[in-house]
Amino acid sequence: MSSELIVMTFPFRHKAETVLAAVRVMRKSPILCLGSVAVATKDPTGEVTLRPGEEPAGVQENRDTALLLSLAGLILGDPAQEAVDAIVAGGLDRQFMSEVARRMAGESSALFVLAREDGVHDAGETRSTLALFRGRLHQTSLPPEVEAYLSGYESRFVESQATQTNQ
């Protein structure tokens, strides 16, 4: 089962939320890979807010969503250099990371989608659907080594996000 990371960036702060809602309404079959989605928004002061694309009970237990939140935090936040080096060494494209971060300048938003080709879901169909909306589409493969690293990293990231939210 291969994994693909699809990120759609928008030059408007609330556009990612609007697009996600529209895609969910127009979705006619489970072929779209929308089970694991994270939404990132950047306000005028440059603060990035990350949240799951869905709010089901037990979202913290959804491994893929937690992985996406960690990865989005690494790409858009002020990450530790060793974490960036580890995921680049694991095979994540540094150019991809730089391009996504660059597109999130000013007030902006993004959808992070983890698309797993598993015989039911189709990453190509997901990309085609997202391309209907006026944003910038970025995609890369997500190697198993990066997923393994993020699995350990995600719990530390989620804990730090919860601490920041409660302050």
Residue map of PLM features:
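Positively charged, small/polar-rich N-terminal and surface patches that mediate targeting and assembly
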Residues: 1-110, 115-167
